[in-house]
Amino acid sequence: MTNPMRSQFDIAWALTSYHFEGLTTEECLWRPATVGLHVHRDPDGEWRADWPDREGYDIGPPSIAWITWHINFWWSMTLDQSFGPGTLTREAVTWPGSADAVRSSGHHLRLGRRPFRAAIGPRRR
């Protein structure tokens, strides 16, 4: 039997990779509605994500760019708080700017999850 947390991690990563694979930048930046969470380029050229003050359906649907940013944000914060100095802030996590960069940052985060993988244990057969 495999370690349940390890199996969940592997499944989550496989699903993420599957959905990121054919993603285009145009799809990421497409807005499904006039209101909703999205990313915006700041004066320094960095892509910043909207951050809602509250949750609710009236906020509108998020763009794919925002969803990919949020995945990156969640994993970055989790790794920093669990295995790093715990000093990372939301403002320091930016959207990478393209679908190719989303895939690259996801791969980088997966490699950065080695401490997480070590903590949940090796795959058992």
Task: Set out the residue ranges of the language-model regions.
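Low-complexity, Ser/Thr/Pro/Gly-enriched N-terminal "stalk/linker" regions
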Residues: 14-47
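Short, helix-capping/interhelical loops that line the mouth of catalytic, cofactor-
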Residues: 1-5, 34-58, 62, 68-125
